[in-house]
Amino acid sequence: MAPLALMGVVLLLGVPHCLGEATPTPSLPPPTANDSDASPEGCQGSYRCQPGVLLPVWEPEDPSLGDKVARAVVYFVAMVYMFLGVSIIADRFMASIEVITSKEKEITITKANGETSVGTVRIWNETVSNLTLMALGSSAPEILLTVIEVCGHNFQAGELGPGTIVGSAAFNMFVVIAVCVYVIPAGESRKIKHLRVFFVTASWSIFAYVWLYLILAVFSPGVVQVWEALLTLIFFPVCVVFAWMADKRLLFYKYVYKRYRTDPRSGIIIGAEGDPPKSIELDGTFVGTEVPGELGALGTGPAEARELDASRREVIQILKDLKQKHPDKDLEQLMGIAKYYALLHQQKSRAFYRIQATRLMTGAGNVLRRHAADAARRPGATDGAPDDEDDGASRIFFEPSLYHCLENCGSVLLSVACQGGEGNSTFYVDYRTEDGSAKAGSDYEYSEGTLVFKPGETQKDLRIGIIDDDIFEEDEHFFVRLLNLRVGDAQGMFEPDGGGRPKGRLVAPLLATVTILDDDHAGIFSFQDRLLHVSECMGTVDVRVVRSSGARGTVRLPYRTVDGTARGGGVHYEDACGELEFGDDETMKTLQVKIVDDEEYEKKDNFFIELGQPQWLKRGISALLLNQGNGDKKITAEQEEAQRIAEMGKPVLGENNRLEVIIEESYDFKNTVDKLIKKTNLALVIGTHSWREQFIEAVTVSAGDEEEDEDGPREERLPSCFDYVMHFLTVFWKVLFACVPPTEYCNGWACFGVCILVIGVLTALIGDLASHFGCTVGLKDSVNAVVFVALGTSIPDTFASKVAALQDQCADASIGNVTGSNAVNVFLGLGVAWSVAAVYWAVQGRPFEVRAGTLAFSVTLFTVFAFVCIAVLLYRRRPQIGGELGGPRGPKLATTALFLGLWFLYILFSSLEAYCHIRGF
């Protein structure tokens, strides 16, 4: 209610001068720069309306009181409706800017070990985009209003455009920040993350308005010279470059190291030059420290590599948090939640929050929630095309293809499978044995024959005889091959080989391998390989220990883990130490080691598993033979030979008795992170791909729910009454602006250009309506600009900052861009307009005159109040409060009241000065 009451006071300021007049004040020529604003005409304003850029004067020019009221209502309602239209087209405009600034490029990163990896990073620097396209998008009405006002009035300076820029700056600095401070929930606070950039933009913001005062009241009072106007415009790229340097720590940031700390008593930030520190810098990072793991080395690499590393760490942290919250879900299920969670919690641009606020206000719904609902309704991708080999033919192969048997087993049984097909044919397939290291006749019995699969049969067995001997020998193997497939009908009659699709085929594995294990030795114990690569997400790794060259007797085999670069004790893996007991004729055992899942994007740590000396549990004849020489009793030659043979059969370690285990990152986890980085691009959420999509979106009413569920999107609720009302109020604008090219066309530039033109037309209409409203009620353009026009252009930014303050983890998106926008408004808005006008009048041989009185007073007042505002924000970084936004209830309410009071005083003093109640400059 306070802003409404303030507007009423402003409207009443000019009334006392006009109550006693029977007729309107006659029209006078506009005063020049040398005229005093204290003249009766300058103090009370004029009821005589002038033609606008697009709108003519409403005839007749001398209406009655009732007609004046009706006209004022029409102008005011039309102006509000135009503000709604500008907000909606700005929605499209900001979406195109988000698409443009979200463009990515691939970079190749070479690590210290020579390995390379490819990633994608944004082409646009965040700070540069915020101060250029983002600032242009959020301040386009103010900037274009100034340019159109000057160019549309014969290059004469007006009061509406500059007043709107200063008034909008005051509203953003005081009211928007006050709202952001207040809406943070109790007990929470938000800090500016990139404080260095904030210092630079805040300094330029204050300098911009100091510079305005200097060129209006000091250098050349009442006249803007060409060099002043051009220098104002040049300050815009200079400001952007300085902010970019601060963000990148270039020049003096590179050569002068500073330590920043906060005095616990005063809360003042203290800097001291010196060696590279290891304390917290202004942006919250640690200088001189590296991130653990290989990616930490990227901290000294290119900025793109650091940016990619930061994006990966954010996504990894999201997956870790969700895994702790939902331990029962697998990675695929977590990815579905993580997509929404990443969109919800990632740092968002000013464009996103502006679009989100506009759509919530106009009944278009929550951007993220609608995107999640559309993704859920969208049919999933197919699992892939069917296998080319799955053509309806039966497939015949060994299952399994590897067999092990002891030398004394007598025979080994092999299985052949028949899968697929129609099951109404008879198949004949031949088999035969082939020598390997085992020879037919001495180690196994040669065999060949034919297997017959009748209709419906899916498995056939064949048996191969094994020859036993008492000679100690190494493990040997031979092969069994399938060949010569023939097809018959159900009765078994062979069918001719036609040219059509085959009914059956032999597929791999066609060759089975049979390994004969010697049973005359206790065995050689070893790992299957010297090296084992495991993924950190495995949880538990199973390591096989094989017993070859014999399997006689019971053997106990000790083992233990040894640290390498990986650390045991639960850091990278759990220590394992124990014994494996191999029974008689047992050829394989498995030991388990638990791996700790650190969920790292890149990882390569190793540890070792060592086997101890095997112990033969002395039982039966082996124990007797080995213990015969322990006593004094002499043994015979036969006994000595038997003992020697038994000694040869003792268990021993093989060559691979030490296994190196390399723990690597989970490839599924790594792929998930890469997919999430690609899919969490907000340009995919707020952008449009076709006109059809835009028109459907324009006529659809959605619930404007600001609350977000971190566990994923909830069920879509029905729109409220407010959503329907706002939708029907704005449906004309929505359908009209659905004709704008989709953001996907020309990478967003087509939409960008059309939106600029549309915003320009609407801004010209707003300027004319505001001017006609002011002259109808007797309100001066300077007051009209700082109150009504500035308020109308800044309302969407207020809601955008509110949403950003609630949803972002830091304060940069909500208030960090306020100072940058204020500076850009002056340098770009006034710089372009005044440069064009100054050059035009210089060519004509005349000066470009600008009345300094009201504008200079407003600029000075705003600058003083802005110093107070920034000082309070920095003071709020004390530990007792916690940050620029939120904090304890007392300081939060006090800050909100102070900032709203500053805005109230700014409007009041500017209005009093405009109506000559107080003396200005």
Curated annotation (Swiss-Prot):
Keyword Endoplasmic reticulum appears in the UniProt entry: no
Keywords of the record: Antiport, Calcium, Calcium transport, Calmodulin-binding, Cell membrane, Glycoprotein, Ion transport, Membrane, Metal-binding, Phosphoprotein, Repeat, Signal, Sodium, Sodium transport, Transmembrane, Transmembrane helix, Transport
Positions contributing to Ca(2+) 6 binding: 598-600
Activity control mechanisms: Calcium transport is down-regulated by Na(+) and stimulated by Ca(2+).
Residues annotated as binding Ca(2+) 2: 407, 468-469, 519-520
Sites where the protein binds Ca(2+) 4: 443, 469, 473, 476
Residues given in the record as Ca(2+) 1 binding sites: 407, 443, 469, 473
GO molecular function, one term: calcium ion transmembrane transporter activity
Phenotype upon loss of function: No obvious phenotype. In hippocampus pyramidal neurons, calcium exchange activity is reduced by about half, suggesting that other, additional calcium exchangers are active in these neurons. In these neurons, the neurotransmitter glutamate triggers a sharp increase in cellular Ca(2+) that does not depend on calcium exchanger activity. In contrast, the decrease to basal levels is mediated by calcium exchangers, and is considerably slower in mutant mice than in wild-type.
One family name in Pfam for this protein: Calx-beta
Signal sequence annotation: 1-20
Glycan attachment sites: 125, 130
InterPro entries membership: CaCA (IPR051171), CalX-like_sf (IPR038081), Calx_beta (IPR003644), Na_Ca_Ex (IPR004836), Na_Ca_Ex_C-exten (IPR032452), NaCa_Exmemb (IPR004837), NCX_ion-bd_dom_sf (IPR044880)
Annotated region described as Putative calmodulin-binding region, given as residue ranges: 248-267
Ranges of residues in domain Calx-beta: 389-482, 512-611
Record-linked Gene3D superfamilies: 2.60.40.2030, NCX, central ion-binding region (1.20.1420.30)
Reaction catalysed by this enzyme: Ca(2+)(in) + 3 Na(+)(out) = Ca(2+)(out) + 3 Na(+)(in)
Subcellular location, record wording: Cell membrane; Basolateral cell membrane
Membrane-topology descriptor: Multi-pass membrane protein
Transmembrane segments: 69-89, 131-151, 165-185, 197-217, 226-246, 721-741, 749-769, 786-806, 823-843, 855-875, 893-913
PANTHER family reported for this sequence: SODIUM/CALCIUM EXCHANGER (PTHR11878), SODIUM_CALCIUM EXCHANGER 2 (PTHR11878:SF8)
Stated family: Belongs to the Ca(2+):cation antiporter (CaCA) (TC 2.A.19) family. SLC8 subfamily.
Protein name: Sodium/calcium exchanger 2
Source organism (scientific name): Mus musculus
Lineage of the species this protein comes from: Eukaryota, Metazoa, Chordata, Craniata, Vertebrata
